Design a protein with these regions (language model features):
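ATP-binding/phosphotransfer module of carbohydrate and carboxylate kinases, centering on a glycine-rich
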Residues: 4-12, 49-182
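Glycine-rich phosphate-binding loop of actin/hexokinase-like ATP-binding domains
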Residues: 11-64
Length: 182
């Protein structure tokens, strides 16, 4: 949906990541979704960002991006500081609290590490960030400030934007694909 009707409209190649319970997404190349050999491409949450955790863990997602960068990860990290904050809205309503802001900033560091890896691998013109948590302006502001220091200068041109379609992206994408088959 984002490729045709939203933030990716008119872009030839871009990545779309969704942060929620986990981290998933899509790779768009030449205005087409890249599916991979088993139609499973875009499992960005499975990228290993913490090798020591992966090597010592037993769960397939130990040490992986979504364990540290998903909205679920943020809520879990915040619960160690204030268990009464159980969702993104509550967390960002308390962002002025130094202890909350510190945890949020560590979480954004995790997001940026994964994004920098993906930017270096795919060299997209644009990265679209979706999921309910990504409507918080502070997150995108911080990502814009941090990405240039995390990527090689030849990759710093990448545009990073919020998804525009919210929860309608999947439905609109399915509609578009079905209409192309008719």
């Amino acid at each position: 949906g984002e490729a045709v009707f939203g933030a990716g409209k008119g872009k030839n190649s871009f990545l779309c990541l969704t942060y929620g319970t986990g981290v998933g997404g899509a790779i768009i190349e030449n205005k087409q979704v890249y599916h991979g050999s088993s139609f499973s491409a875009g499992e960005f949450g499975a990228i290993i960002t913490h090798a020591e955790e992966k090597l010592s863990g037993t769960d397939p997602f130990d040490g992986c991006y979504e364990r540290y960068a998903s909205a679920t990860a943020l809520v879990k990290m915040i619960s160690a500081v204030d268990p009464s904050l159980i969702n993104g809205r509550q967390i960002f309503a308390n962002l002025e609290r130094p202890e909350i802001k510190e945890v949020v900033n560590k979480w954004i560091d995790e997001i940026v590490l994964g994004l920098a890896t993906l930017i270096h691998i795919f060299n997209p013109s644009c990265v679209v960030l979706g999921g309910g948590i990504m409507v918080q302006p502070y997150i995108l502001e911080q990502i814009h400030a941090r990405i240039p220091q995390m990527v090689m200068s030849s990759f710093a041109h990448v545009q990073i934007s919020s998804a525009e379609l919210g929860n309608s992206a999947g439905l609109l994408g399915a509609y578009y694909l079905a209409s192309q088959k008719l």
